[in-house]
Structure formats: structure tokens, C-alpha cells
Amino acid sequence: MPKPEIVFVTGNANKLREVSMILGGDASPFTLVNEPLDLEELQGADLQEIALAKLQQAVHALGPGRPVFVEDTALSFDEFNGLPGAYIKWFIKSMGLAKVVKMLDSFENKGAYAITTIAYADSKGQLHVFQGKTHGTIVDSRGHTNFGWDSIFQPDESQNNETYAEMAKEDKNKISQRGRAFAQLKEYLYNTGI
């Protein structure tokens, strides 16, 4: 009997690989299917509102009854009262990583926190939200630069003062905001089904 499918709407191949690993890969009781839909991203500071708006678009595009989830991740600087937050990818796209780091040059506190918000619609159309959070420090870029801001975020729980980009994937997934949020989704799915 084939495993039930759950749809992850993302166009980010790195994110897809990471989430597949966190949810159990081939050993999971469901099949993770990717739909790279082009969703309009609501602009704002409320992460749950942003994720739920993306989810509603995904449900509309895929049709009712298909279990589907979306995620949105924010990186917030302590000194900037939550900014750039959900706008981080636009900051990086327009300024580059080095200038994003430079924004904190005049501040002693380089503290930051990352939040991943997952919005999930089950097969009955019920909506669920899961969030994970990790605190850390903004540092000069270290490690690969092919996955967003991973090379400038050093989580407080890093054993060797490594950025996400320098960490082994398995280690990163244990402490990252995305790993924490998807661990909640995984527990929910494994306990209640899709």
C-alpha cells in the first residue's frame, strides 16, 4: 500500500532537502511531495499571518483535501526590535550578506534570533501552526553562502562557535529554528496522521 502524500510548497531546493531529512526521509510514514508554486508573500511583521496567507494560496491552488504545508523564516536583530524579521531575504537580495552584517557595526550587541513558522492544512482542511526559535549572534560570513543567511548566524547552542553554514546538517537540524518547528510538525503528523 502506498504511503499517503503530504505537499511542501517551496521553490528552495536547500529547504526541501533539509525538511525531508528532519521529517524522516524515506523512513517516514508519508511521502513528501514538492510543489514549487509561486505564492505571493504577504508583507508584514506577523509571522503567523504571513504563513497562513501563503497556506491559503497553496490550498486554493492545489485544491481541498490535500495535506499541505508552507514555511516562512525570519531573522531578527535584537538592536533593531525585530527587524529585518520576515524581510531578511529582501535585505540579503538587495544588500548582500556583508552589508547586512555591517548594519550592526555601530552596536555592541550583535544578538539575533531566528524563527520558522509552519502553516499546515490537514486533509480535512483544518489549519495548524508550528513555530521554532533559536537565539544567536550575527557574525562575519563563515562557511558556504548558498543557503540564505546561514553563514552569518552563529547559534548560541553551537558546540564549536560555528555558523549554521559551518555545522554538519544533522547538528544544525537539532538546534535550528527550522529543525525545532519541523520536529513539532513531525510529532503531530506521526501522532495524528495527515
Swiss-Prot record:
Its EC number is 3.6.1.66. One of its GO terms (biological process) is deoxyribonucleoside triphosphate catabolic process. Pfam families: Ham1p_like (PF01725). Its cofactor is Mg(2+); Mn(2+). Its main location: cytoplasm. GO terms for cellular component: cytoplasm; nucleus. Mg(2+) binds at residue 41. Keywords: Cytoplasm, Hydrolase, Magnesium, Manganese, Metal-binding, Nucleotide metabolism, Nucleotide-binding, Nucleus. It comes from the Eukaryota. ITP binds at residues 10-15, 54, 72-73, 89, 147-150, 172, 177-178. Transmembrane segments: none annotated. GO terms for molecular function: dITP diphosphatase activity; ITP diphosphatase activity; metal ion binding; nucleotide binding; XTP diphosphatase activity. Homodimer. This is Inosine triphosphate pyrophosphatase. It comes from Kluyveromyces lactis (strain ATCC 8585 / CBS 2359 / DSM 70799 / NBRC 1267 / NRRL Y-1140 / WM37) (Yeast).
